[in-house]
Structure formats: C-alpha cells, structure tokens
Amino acid sequence: MWGFIVTCGIFLVLLCQLRLLSKRKSKSTPYNALLPNVTVFAMGGTIAGCANSSLEIVNYIPGSVGIEKLIEAVPAIKAIANINGVQVTNMGSENLTPADVLKLAKLILAEVAKPNVHGIVITHGTDSLEETAMFLDLTISTAKPIVVVGAMRPSTAIGADGPMNLLNAVAVASSNQSMGRGTLVLLNDRIGSAFYTTKTNGNTLDTFKSYEAGSLGIVLNQKPFYFFSPAVPTGKVFFDIYNIKQLPRVDILYGYQGLNPKLAESAVHLGAKGLVLAAMGATSWTDDGNEVISSLIREHNIPVVYSHRTAEGYSSNSCLGIPSYFLNPQKARYMLMLAISSGYSIRDIEGLFSIK
C-alpha cells in the first residue's frame, strides 16, 4: 500500500515538473532553422541605461540593464534571427579599457569561427564606441557582418532610440548584403564604416558621421540598403591578436596655445610606449614641443603619430613624426598600439600609416 502511495506521489511530482517545463518552453522562442544565427555581445552603455524618469535623458546610470532584458524589449528581433546574447561587461564605455576590448575581440574571433554563426552585434556605450569599433575592424578578419550599436537615450526614456537601433543592427548582421564590409557602426538608421565613423555630438541622436568618407548605407523597415559594393578602406590592415596578452600604453596629447612641452616626456616616463598628438591644424605642434618629441624619438625610440584635433582633415607628412593621414587621434591610437604589439619598427609604422 505504502509503495503504491509513494509511486503515485513520485508520478505527481514528475507530472508537475513536466507541466512547468512545458510552460517554460512555451514562453521561449523555438529555434527557427530558416533564420540566421546572430550573437549579441553586450558591453553596457546608454543603450542599457536607466533613469528615474522617462523624461530624463542626461542623468542616468549606464549599463543597468542586462542583455536578456534588452532582447526582450524588442520582440520583433525574433522574426529576423535566432539570437544568442552574451554579457561581456555592463558599464559606461568611458570606463572600458584596452584589456576589455582585447577580450571582446578574442570572443568575437572564436564566435565567427563557428560555421553556424551568420553575424555579430555588439551593444556598446557611445562615448568610446568608435574606438572599440576601430579595434575590431583592425583585428577581426572575416566576411561575416560585425555591427557595433549604441543609443543616445537611456532605455527608460520616452522615444528611446536603443530598441530600434538594436533591431536594425540585428537586421544588418543578418543580411548577406553586409558580408565583406568590415566592422560596421549602426545608429539612427545609418550604416558607417568603423574605420571612418566618429561621434560628433554628445547629445543628439544623429551624432555618428563619417564626414568625407560618407555613410555606407541606411536601414529602411529593417532592410539594409547599401550605396556601394563592399570595399576595403585605404590603409586598412589586419593584426593577429592571438598571442597578444596585453596592449602597450599609448597616450594622446592635445595641442593648444602655450602647450607644456614636457607633457610628452612625462607620458613616456609614466610608461607610454608610443604617443599620438591631436595637433593643431594639419599637424602643427609648438617648436619647443617638437624639440622634446625629437629627443624622445631619437633617444627612446618612441613612435610619435601626428593626428589632428580638427573634426576632419588630412595630417600631412610635413610633421616631425608619423602622420596619421585621415585617422583621428583615437583611431590612430589603437592602430599604433597594435603595431607596437606586433613588433613593428618605427619605419614599419611609417609605412603602416602612409597612403600609397
């Protein structure tokens, strides 16, 4: 008798568990073999930010929402791709370090090596988004789409741009038309090359622009429309980061009237292995500042790249060091860091930045 009761009890427990499992399964989205597989790596930022009011778009806490909630907020994504969300970090992008970006790049390299993965999306804070995007563009050699996306309004705001940006990013990463275009930046319906796209305004939605290079395309109704066939930006190279454990320190110095010429020397004494100058005009640096730079190059073999503090422009080869040509300081910095990590000599670095 007791055996029968125990057996019935076990049966009821199993039945309840099966019902719970069936309910859980009914809430989840079944895998659709007809849809592409897209992996979303979450880094935090405004797109995952929260404020105390739906009217607040300035004072909020970035990196407050996890990847699961971000995906749940955009149900339409499930009709575009099978999504695999991975939380890498969850912070404002001003706090990201080269170590974080190196870790992300290696995770992406492992993911794109999987034959069933069609594309990658990275949700990211906009403050340093272009830096991460540039690093990925220089280190991920794949035809598969890699799309970096962010938002200018927190997730709690009326008219939050994050959900639509994320939906469009997944659409771009799912499209065969996005193949072979390198790392892309997607915000406000515009698709740009990571090599040229930069943040131009700290507040407005239409902040990411590519200036002279122009946008690669736009997204309409979750369909990417490209203006050009896939092309490689002039001067773009790939660096193998498989054996890189730590990136060298490279500092950016800003040019201005009355510049302290000793700042460059101090940066090197504090551990900088290379310098990027956000120079005035094309590549103008103060005379006494150039004397210090010359000494650092000659005595310490420090590579110094001259970029420009202007929003756009060309850094000419009339400077004392290595001109960045069309790369802004923050993009030139990561290229220099990777070159130093890869054992490039100063002459090699000159060739790397030169436009043939």
Curated annotation (Swiss-Prot):
Its EC number is 3.5.1.1. GO terms for molecular function: asparaginase activity. Disulfide bonds: none annotated. It is found in: Secreted, Cell wall. GO terms for cellular component: cell surface; cytoplasm; extracellular region; periplasmic space. Keywords: Cell wall, Glycoprotein, Hydrolase, Secreted, Signal. The keyword Signal applies. Residues 1-22 form the signal peptide. It catalyses: L-asparagine + H2O = L-aspartate + NH4(+). Substrate binds at S93, T126, D127. The keyword Signal applies. The active site is at T46. InterPro entries: AsnASE_II (IPR004550), Asp/glu_Ase-like_sf (IPR036152), Asparaginase/glutaminase-like (IPR006034), Asparaginase_C (IPR040919), L-asparaginase_C (IPR027473), L-asparaginase_N (IPR027474), L-asparaginase_N_sf (IPR037152). Belongs to the asparaginase 1 family. This is Probable L-asparaginase 4.
